[in-house]
A protein has these predicted regions:
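Hydrophobic alpha-helical segments and helix pairs
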Residues: 35-77, 83
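Structural signature of hydrophobic alpha-helical transmembrane segments
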Residues: 22-36, 128-137
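C-terminal ends of transmembrane helices
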Residues: 2-3, 40-48, 145-152
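Small-residue-rich transmembrane alpha-helices that serve as helix-helix interface/gating elements
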Residues: 189-199
Length: 216
């Protein structure tokens, strides 16, 4: 309720604080590491795209529902390529939480002398996670393609932009999976892309209805 009356940057701050508190309940060591990463991402996000805070929050949430592909399609449809930056931050947050979850049991048994090795291990896992670069890269290409097609002076440009974004998303992940052997499940990715494209068409319909009503 509070976030409905505050800037999107406040939404991101509250979401990060909420995550840190939950992580701290499991392991204070992990909470400190998460807080450091969040501070860096938050400063980066505030510097370049503070108005798109909902993108950072939406990607981890939609990833749990297997439809994060909706975000780049919608951002190319209603925003501009600057949303590549907050979408990359959202991808980093999602995979960071996955890595922290994998190290939960290990960190609970650590003594004080093991803090530095623990942080080093988690940080290396985050750096070595090639899926972060792959997903961020594919999302960036999708945003650019959807935005470019949407801006064309032709009929049904928005509809074609959604279809183009969905096709680029599917082939982008297929190529990356064949080339880099990612952890992306192909069947789930294709199904999620189809659902995301359908949701984008629904959002486009309601956007046009609202625009038409406003004109009247």
């Amino acid at each position: 309720l509070l976030c409905a009356f505050t800037p999107s940057s406040i939404l991101v701050f509250l979401a990060m604080a909420f995550v840190i508190l939950h992580v701290a309940a499991v392991s204070p060591f992990m909470a400190l590491f998460a807080a450091l990463i969040f501070v860096v991402l938050y400063c980066f996000f505030l510097r370049f795209a503070p108005q798109y805070g909902y993108v950072v929050v939406a990607i981890p949430i939609l990833s749990t529902l297997h439809v994060p592909y909706l975000v780049p399609i919608l951002m190319g449809l209603v925003a501009n390529p600057i949303t590549i930056l907050p979408s990359a931050c959202g991808v980093i947050v999602y995979y960071m939480l996955q890595i922290l979850q994998e190290h939960t049991v290990v960190s609970d048994s650590f003594a004080l002398d093991d803090i530095l090795p623990f942080y080093t291990k988690v940080f290396e896992a985050l750096i070595d996670c090639k899926d972060i670069l792959i997903v961020s890269g594919v999302f960036a290409v999708v945003i650019i393609v959807v935005y470019t097609v949407r801006k064309l002076k032709m009929e049904y440009a928005a509809e074609l932009a959604i279809l183009a974004g969905a096709v680029v998303n599917v082939f982008g992940f297929l190529i990356c999976d064949l080339r880099f052997d990612t952890r992306v499940t192909i069947g789930s990715m294709i199904g999620g892309t189809l659902l995301s494209a359908l949701a984008a068409f629904v959002a486009l319909f309601f956007k046009r209805v609202l625009d038409y009503t406003a004109v009247e």
